Amino acid sequence: MRSGYLYALGAFGLWGVLPIYWQLIREVPALQVVCHRIIWSVLLLVPLLSWTGQWPVAMAAIGNPATMIRQVAASIFLAINWLAFVWAVSNGRMIESSLGYYINPLLNVLLGVLLLGERLRHGQTIAILLAATGVGWLSWHVGTVPWIAIALASSFCLYGLAKKTTSVPPLVSLWIEATVLLFPAIVYLTGQHLQGKGAFGVHGLRIDGMLLASGIVTSVPLWCFANAAQKLPLSTLGILQYLGPTLQFLLGWWVYKEPFDATRMIGFFLVWTALSIFAWDLVHQGSPARFSTTNDPPASDGNQGPLVGTPKAASELEQ
């Protein structure tokens, strides 16, 4: 059990501090960062699949049309989530991105009601109404809809829904999704370089090295989460998942000095209160994980595993 906590803290802690990594390469346009992340993730996962002996599983998944339809849909939501997160971090919207990951579990529950016919418990109803009030407050008083938070939460949610009925292991799933995006990523980066707009080889060895390592920072938290998911109860993971957005929030507020006035504080307080009620309901009711599949943890960035109230595929997505 102790090792499970260490793996969970490693996964959620890394996801929480990954904004620092993307901030260090903010000179690179967000779409180019995402394309590099796709390419180097594919190349890193190839030997990992060989090492873990999962190529037969990968080939079986590719040969299953129903599985591939879901994987292609998931890859689209994965790309949207990665792009929104990297753009937010690079443009001083880290606090808003943390809001997206805070409200994501509640959005999963709401989608379960709307699309899957699930029933809300009283605690869940109160939590969703409070969170919606918080988001509405921020939209009204700040003057703009927090579209980054909504984009991150909804892409996370739809990613989990796309993978709801699949049982593809996490490394295989991430490799397939990244491979689906590989050709568009290569075409886009090639076009950017031909137009003289490519970032690789332009900003120095540090930036180039960090782009190359983007596959590692994508895969390591996923590996940690996959181990944690095998060793800890889902309710424990459901609580620990909030470490990631909390670290993101603290980075944005304390380290990067993003604006957080009294108006924003009220909106976040409503959301945090909603999450406290949601967590209490989760612990006392022992609710099963939403959108979970037998073997597939949530995805990062870029954006978190088979969590109660979160898509199991979140670990590939976050940051």
Question: Would you name each region that the model predicts?
Answer:
Residues 1-10, 43-73, 122, 174, ...:
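Membrane-interface interhelical linkers
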Residues 1-32, 133-165, 187, 251, ...:
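Glycine-/small-residue-enriched transmembrane alpha-helix faces in small-molecule transporters
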Residues 9, 13-17, 21, 72-89, ...:
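Hydrophobic alpha-helical transmembrane segments of multi-pass membrane transport proteins
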Residues 25, 33, 88-89, 114-116, ...:
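Hydrophobic/aromatic residues within transmembrane alpha-helices
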Residues 27-32, 83-100, 223-240, 259:
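Structural motif at transmembrane-helix junctions in multi-pass transporters
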Residues 87, 104-124, 246-265:
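C-terminal transmembrane-helix exit sites in multi-pass transporters
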Residues 99-103, 170-180, 219-254:
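Helix-helix packing/entry segments at the starts of transmembrane helices
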Residues 123-139, 150-152, 263-282:
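Hydrophobic transmembrane alpha-helices of multi-pass small-molecule transport proteins
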